[in-house]
Amino acid sequence: MSRKLIPVLLVLAILLTACSNPSTPQTVEVTRVVEVTRMVEVTRVVEAPAQPAATVAPATPAPAPPAPQAPGFGETLKKVTARGKLICGVNSQVPGFGFVDSSGAYAGFDVDFCKALAAAIFNDVSKIEYRPVTAEQRFPALQSGEIDVLIRNTTWTLVRDTDNGGNFVATTFYDGQGMMVPKSLNATKLEDLASGTICVQKGTTTELNLADQMTARKIQYTPAVFDDANSTFAAYAEGRCDAVTTDKSGLISRRSVLANPDDNVILDVTMSKEPLGPMVRQGDDQWFDIVKWTVFATIAGEEFGVTTANVTDMAANPKTPEMRRLLGADEKVDLGAKLGLSKDWAVNVIKGVGNYGEIYDRNLGPATKTAIPRGLNSLYANGGLLYSPPFR
């Protein structure tokens, strides 16, 4: 007889017994059925035990696939290397930052970051074409591809970061807007300029900030707007306005070349925050990374004490694991390859232009005419805002 029929026959037998003896409580019989059923089920389990699943050794996880790349990824570096030079949009009218020196060569703090980028790509700071652009020309020049990168005392703002087809990569100089006046005016605050005329350059955050500040303080004034920096400061020097406004660094550099610098004072007022830095065209993340990490390499160089004079020795005998990675001395790690550059790209940058501190001192330090105190542009360890993300 099939074992599967046993529970059924037992149930039938119990039901028949219950019908023939109605005085017997049915609850007892139900209990017996449950007990029998349980016994049968246990028997079945014992007779047909479940087989344990075979143990399988964990497989080695497959490497993660590379992140998908946007259509424009790598196009700028290909274009620059095929051309054999970098086209850098710069200012030609701000001493200390971007100007043409007495020998006819471009020089300045911003210009040196163009050179740093050329060193990272070509290991040659001379492979650059400088393209001077005004405040109004700079964004169209970047959008159209006329220039590869814009490094021209440009303030990082939300609108510029979203509406102009470009991305800011890092802040190279922390500044703030100021106001310069003739000492003879005896002005000490913005309110002293009420009903006056103020020279300002068109197409700049300076023009917008001036309007914001004077409106907030309810000061009536007349703006005298000019197309470029030279025209703006020429008008001030000629006495066509009572004051001139731009970034404080620009005021300091411009005052240094006036006929009588000491006859002019910069008011003790800061009208805005002005983080200045390079800008690249949107759509090429590799190029964005190259420019960004070139800036950080100069800052890290100063943090680690790597200079133009000792970079070769430091690369041969790096003192820390991070310095080893930065200078391409780690046999297992090639950070340059992540950027599409050579393994020693950061060595080439520091060898070509120096670390951030060297760049600053050469163009804006105490031995220069401009002589701008570092202030916020000091390393974080020295009370400033500058530090590099980790090189790892």
Protein language model features and the residues they cover:
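Short, hydrophobic alpha-helical packing/hinge segments within bilobed ligand-binding/sensory domains
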Residues: T76, F113-C114, Q137-L142, A229-A235, ...
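Bilobed "Venus flytrap"/periplasmic-binding protein-like clamshell domains
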Residues: I87-G96, Y106-I121, T155, D175-F233
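Acidic, polar ligand-binding/catalytic clefts
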Residues: K115, A119, N123-D192, S249-T270, ...
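Sec-exported extracytoplasmic/periplasmic mature domains
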Residues: T81-K85, A118-S126, Q143-I147, T155, ...
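Intrinsically disordered, low-complexity Ser/Thr/Pro-rich tracts
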Residues: M1-E75, K79
